[in-house]
Design a protein with these regions (language model features):
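Membrane-embedded alpha-helical bundles of multi-pass integral membrane proteins
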Residues: 2-229
Length: 229
């Protein structure tokens, strides 16, 4: 069993990241080499888009806010939660004073960021069971949402165990030692990473995250992921 744990936590991580990076580069090259569309979907008279307006449309979804305010709330919560989650993972690797404007220990939010993401994903998932979204959905949409839900669930369980259940066998130092050893290409698994009471949550979290990175491009999931809502 320890051999399986090691494969998931070390070689599979390198494989998943390698596949994801390679897939990203291939997709970028295809986009750059692809033919440019001679026409656009803009309505005449065409107005030149300003970069501030483009950023506003990209990050704040004004059209969704006007037509589907409830969906907009969950979209904002989901995307803000993802940013905070990304920062939290960075803080497991490095001490980043920039993010300590509000003093906190990783992760920011005391466990509620993960809870917010889980509720948002459930909203996106159940929304796909109703018309007209159901008719526009494909199985891949459900698979991605369920996979993301499980990744965040097991990751949040590790945070909740430490914060809410006072079950801190896997410490922040253990996580940091594990991540930094991977980045340095000198992988070393702390004892608690595979032998503590809730090490299975770390292993499942990493295993599912690996699957997500590996299959992200094989199932043409870039578009599906960006249109989860």
């Amino acid at each position: 069993m320890q051999t399986i744990f090691y494969i998931i936590l070390v070689p599979m991580v390198y494989l998943a990241v390698g596949v994801f990076v390679l897939g990203t580069l291939v997709r970028i090259v295809k986009i750059l080499k692809g033919p440019k569309h001679p026409t656009t979907l803009q309505i005449y008279p065409e107005r030149k888009a300003k970069w501030l307006g483009t950023l506003y449309d990209t990050f704040f979804f004004p059209t969704v806010r006007r037509h589907k305010p409830v969906l907009w709330v969950f979209l904002i919560l989901f995307h803000v939660g993802l940013v905070l989650l990304f920062i939290g993972h960075l803080e497991l690797i490095w001490d980043l004073g920039l993010f300590q404007i509000i003093p906190h220990e990783p992760f920011l939010g005391k466990g509620f960021v993960g809870l917010t993401l889980l509720v948002s994903l459930l909203f996106f998932l159940f929304r796909r069971f109703s018309s007209p979204v159901r008719e526009l959905s494909v199985p891949e949409d459900y698979y991605l949402l369920i996979l993301l839900f499980l990744i965040i669930l097991f990751g949040s369980q590790m945070d909740w165990a430490r914060r809410w259940y006072d079950y801190g066998e896997l410490s922040l130092e253990d996580y940091r030692d594990y991540f930094t050893s991977l980045i340095a290409f000198r992988p070393e698994l702390p004892y608690n990473a595979t032998f503590s009471g809730h090490s299975f949550m770390l292993i499942l979290h990493v295993f599912l995250a690996n699957l997500f990175l590996i299959f992200f491009f094989f199932f043409q999931s870039m578009h599906a992921f960006l249109s989860l809502h």
